[in-house]
């Protein structure tokens, strides 16, 4: 059976990996997953990521911990294949009053809610991370 929502699967792997205190997790790679991993790395929620080439490219994410506690407290899918959620620049949400981030897919690429607001862009809200 094919996977219905690969992004939700990615977020679940991150959540489960940190719950099990894994050093790194791997998953099938895609352009959107790499873009999301890049935003998470920029914002300091994951240590790093790399693409392992092969017959099927794999995305390997190195998870980040602070004092043996996961840096990612919660990671939640917002827009999903059955119900896409789009917001204009002035409607972009602040996650935990600005302490968390919303990952937004815009016409200029995947970025945080802060970067999208600064660029004056709206888009699809992929997930919330806190």
From Swiss-Prot:
Query: What SUPFAM superfamilies does the record tag this protein with?
Result: Ribosomal protein S8
User: Which domain of life does this protein belong to?
Assistant: Bacteria
Which molecular-function annotations from GO does this UniProt entry contain? rRNA binding; structural constituent of ribosome
Keywords, comma-separated and alphabetical? Ribonucleoprotein, Ribosomal protein, RNA-binding, rRNA-binding
**What are the GO BP annotations of this UniProt entry?**
translation
Cross-referenced InterPro entries, in alphabetical order?
Ribosomal_uS8 (IPR000630), Ribosomal_uS8_CS (IPR047863), Ribosomal_uS8_sf (IPR035987)
Its family? Belongs to the universal ribosomal protein uS8 family.
Q: What does this protein do?
A: One of the primary rRNA binding proteins, it binds directly to 16S rRNA central domain where it helps coordinate assembly of the platform of the 30S subunit.
Q: How does it assemble?
A: Part of the 30S ribosomal subunit. Contacts proteins S5 and S12.
Name the UniProt record assigns to this protein = Small ribosomal subunit protein uS8
**What is the primary gene name for this protein?**
rpsH
